[in-house]
Amino acid sequence: MSNVTVCVRFRPLSHKERKTNGDKVCFKRLDSESFVFKDEREEDVIFSFDRVFYEDAEQSDVYNFLAVPIVADAISGINGTIITYGQTGAGKTYSMEGPSILHCNKQKTGLVQRVVDELFQSLQSSESMAMWSVKLSMVEIYLEKVRDLLDLSKDNLQIKESKTQGIYISGATEVSIQNSSDALECLSEGIANRAVGETQMNLASSRSHCLYIFSVQQGSTSDERVRGGKIILVDLAGSEKVEKTGAEGRVLDEAKTINKSLSVLGNVVNALTTGKPNHVPYRDSKLTRILQDALGGNSRAALLCCCSPSASNAPESLSTVRFGTRTKLIKTTPKSISPEVDSIKKPIPDSHGQNDLRDRILNKLRLSLKEEDVDLLEELFVQEGIIFDPNYSVADIDSACQDAASQEVSLLTQAVEELKETVEELTDENERLRGELELAQEAAAAAAAARADGALLGFVPAVAISSLLRPFGFVPD
């Protein structure tokens, strides 16, 4: 068991904060792990964390303490998650991405760029791993829908769970990346697609929770082992007070959804730290469902609580550090996860074992499929040279097949939902056109009646009548 690593970062005072409150701050520095903060009753409270980063801390300080151990574990096959949390405008996205994902000096680069560099440096320098691969996915949770930032046509992805993968986002685009440059270009594309908006507290406020997902897989030179790890970086949207942000309209709706999901996150943390693990409301929001493994499963986790140092934001900063204090009590059980069976296609000397496993799989499939379908699959296995590792059981491969089927069903479900929306739009358009047609028919009937009475030409020019009725297929003689 291990605790979630929790750090607090105070950003420098902004120009607006200095103009309003001068250099007054809401905390008193003690050391690298503790500070004093006044609560609602103006009483001094000492808060302690794994590390406190004050205004003069560098981006590299945050990365070296918070992220380096998680990257090392991911390369060793243990999943890791890093979450930035805090009030809107507190520096979460700056800590995660820096001022720009592509164009900023080395000193200011954020956690994302540094994780990418560390991953490829470690993998390329490893002598024990003969082969490796890194895949990148990037999604956002916007208005409680999971959207693929690398393929905007996928705007309602489903969250699934399996024995081999744990919690995963079904159908999310996975891009194979070969080096840091490829990764940053891909990340830049995803960031450009992210939902942002302007508020009184932040000119480029994130309106969604963003997840950067790096999947690492390696094969050993000494044996046939293949191990995989995953790093998930989570840039949460900030909690907001409407009276401070001035949100209205759609921005207000976004704020309500953001605050609700963060409230559920707080409920999950409370449930995990108050001795009621059987009643953890992971499914109450998309965010907590995705973070289920990080907070209560087999992943190593770290939390960076970002705070404004200004006295004007003291209530929000106090709420943030209290959330960090509760999160620090969570215990997880990090362990290595085997990669998906269907991703392992490497030569294995024991052909007898391969054939035996293939036959057992086909026999199992015969229980649920037609005989002719199984025969076609057998031909496909032989023609395509699909290899089965005898080290994996039928149950393992069956689980992997079920995962693949679940992903396909998710994509089909999404397509059906999109078709339903299209049908609804066409139905509305059809009703509108039907109404216009009825009006045109009434106008044509009235015109015919007026003409019969010899009164039409006395008050409406014939040209005007022709122009009015021509779009509907009625042209007066």
Swiss-Prot record:
Subcellular location, principal: cytoplasm
One term under GO cellular component: cytoplasm
Parts forming coiled coils: 402-451
Binding site for ATP: G86, Q87, T88, G89, A90, G91, K92, T93
Domain Kinesin motor: 3-330
UniProt record, GO biological process: cytoskeleton-dependent intracellular transport; microtubule-based movement
Gene Ontology molecular function, alphabetical: ATP binding; ATP hydrolysis activity; microtubule binding; plus-end-directed microtubule motor activity
Phenotype upon changing R289H: Diminished microtubule-stimulated ATPase activity, abnormal chromosome congression and segregation and reduced spikelet fertility caused jointly by reduced pollen viability and defective anther dehiscence
Top-level taxon in the UniProt lineage: Eukaryota
SMART domains for this protein: KISc
Tissue: Widely expressed. Expressed in young roots and leaves, in mature roots, culm, sheath and leaves, and in panicles at various developmental stages. Strongest expression is detected in panicles. In the panicle, expression is detected in anthers, glumme, lemma and palea. In the spikelet, expression is detected in both microsporocyte and the anther walls.
Iron among keywords: no
InterPro entries, alphabetized: Kinesin-like_fam, Kinesin_motor_CS, Kinesin_motor_dom, Kinesin_motor_dom_sf, P-loop_NTPase
Nucleotide-binding recorded as keyword: yes
Keywords linked to the UniProt accession: ATP-binding, Coiled coil, Cytoplasm, Microtubule, Motor protein, Nucleotide-binding
Compartments, record wording: Cytoplasm
Role description: Kinesin-like motor protein that exhibits microtubule-stimulated ATPase activity. Plays an essential role in male meiotic chromosomal dynamics, male gametogenesis and anther dehiscence. May play a minor and nonessential role in regulating meiotic spindle formation.
Family affiliation: Belongs to the TRAFAC class myosin-kinesin ATPase superfamily. Kinesin family. KIN-1 subfamily.
Protein name per the record: Kinesin-like protein KIN-1
UniProt organism field: Oryza sativa subsp. japonica (Rice)
Name of the gene: KIN1
